[in-house]
Amino acid sequence: RLIFVCGKEWVDNEETIRNYTIRTLRKCRIANHYGTQNEAVLCIIAEKLYVQDLSEDIFSFEKMLAEISDRIIIVAESPGTFCELGAFVMDEDCRRKTMVINEDNADYENSFITKGPIKKLESLNESSIIRHNGLERIKNSHEYNFKVQEIAKAPLTIAINDNAGSVELKSLIYELANIVELFQPVEYFEIETLYKRLKDFEGY
């Protein structure tokens, strides 16, 4: 499944809760129908996908990533993630699949973030909030580990694209991933050709 993980700006090998969460998710594996195991999660990291000269603004780009994701995890650890939290909580579809990891700090009890988007999310689903007292506590938190595993291994239903005129991006990603899994190593041209033949699409 696709998990959009938001948090402090991504820096390789930096010890942040976001990086730790991504590493934890990547360790989750599930058995497939071919007698082997696959990674259960593909973590979406916006900074690794957004191209600076892309005509689309980064807010709209992240909104698209949120829409195609099965779950959204927001680690509230930077001003940018506070903006993402507010935007995603105000969107009904994003809100229902969002989990927030937030610092349990008395100084923030009356902040806008706590009284606004976090309170709204908590009123709809109390289990969608994980409070912490730092990375080391997160590493030893039974609640954190349980909820992350639950997200990684939740049942998944994917709609099938059967109309070349209205291909859904999320379904397309999963369908192409299945082709790669079955036929790898495979090149882009081969993937596209296989997809169109399997679907009986002239184009999409």
Tell where the protein language model's regions lie, with residue ranges.
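Short, aromatic/basic amphipathic alpha-helical patches
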Residues: 15-29, 110-123
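Basic/polar, acidic-poor N-terminal "presequence/leader" segments
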Residues: 1-23, 183-186
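Short acidic, S/G/P-rich loop/turn micro-motifs used as interaction or catalytic elements
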Residues: 9-16, 48-52, 74, 78-81, ...
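Long, low-complexity, charged/polar intrinsically disordered regions in eukaryotic proteins
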Residues: 116-168
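Donor nucleotide-activated moiety binding/catalytic core segment of transferases
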Residues: 55-72
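Short amphipathic alpha-helical interface segments
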Residues: 165-203
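Cross-kingdom TIR/SEFIR domain
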Residues: 84-131
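Conserved BB-loop
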Residues: 30-59
